[in-house]
């Protein structure tokens, strides 16, 4: 299925330079695109490749357009943020070509009579939906998912196969949860008495907002007393662990294998590189960016980029320290030579 460039720009904005009636079927990289595709330029280093692309149309910034236009003969869509424009265009084409799951409940699914499933929802093979669960309009629950008692799934949310969504948990509209994710397992809560561990019942749940995406095999534990909270627009990659009673602010994004210990409070618009770790009961301000592999061992009160294993510091400070650490061996040798020189001067004076 194709779409006109003019219709695309009318829907997404931007300034079209060229034939509005050109039909395109999708988006492709600069080097792979042909006359049936549009492509995009978001990295100025690829201007030369953009000028040679065979794509029917090129999404680019005004600054890049001034340079590329002389050598590129196709249509151009000038956008303030070409990468974001590409993302929205990709969503549009994905929707055009997407498989539409049929509404209804598969014969092998087990849906409790006290559950409420919207007529427009799609419940796949071998899904279990327990009593009191609510599944709203246009949801897609793929094969093998488990929806616990009194759970709530907002409209147009998609659970891929084998998602486990336990009792009392909720997710808002337009959520995406990938295979193997576990939402609402018990948090790691124990009291120590004489060296033995006493389990603390985890009676809270997990409350997830709208437009949240959760990666494959990611785990979000239920709260001990109050809920674990994931606000609107949060994006979680694969194999992330969110401990009990954490609160993740809106539009924060975490790459794979991030670990957040219990009761940590993370602000809005933060980012975490892969395998970053956050200790429990810490507070992180809005717009904090944690580099990959960093250990956050103290609360962070100011926005900015932070890097390091121990101690954590602002990125610029950490880079300076890293240079010093790298040169410690050479500095030690220089100090030894200086000590020898000073000693020899002292011997001569004697």
UniProtKB/Swiss-Prot annotation:
Which HAMAP family does the entry mention? LpxD
According to its UniProt record, which residues of this chain constitute the active site? 244 (proton acceptor)
This protein is called: UDP-3-O-acylglucosamine N-acyltransferase
Q: Keywords, A to Z?
A: Acyltransferase, Lipid A biosynthesis, Lipid biosynthesis, Lipid metabolism, Repeat, Transferase
Name the encoding gene, please.
lpxD
Which principal EC class is assigned to this enzyme?
transferase
Q: Which GO terms describe its biological process?
A: lipid A biosynthetic process
EC number(s)?
2.3.1.191
Q: Which PANTHER family match?
A: UDP-3-O-ACYLGLUCOSAMINE N-ACYLTRANSFERASE (PTHR43378), UDP-3-O-ACYLGLUCOSAMINE N-ACYLTRANSFERASE 1, MITOCHONDRIAL-RELATED (PTHR43378:SF2)
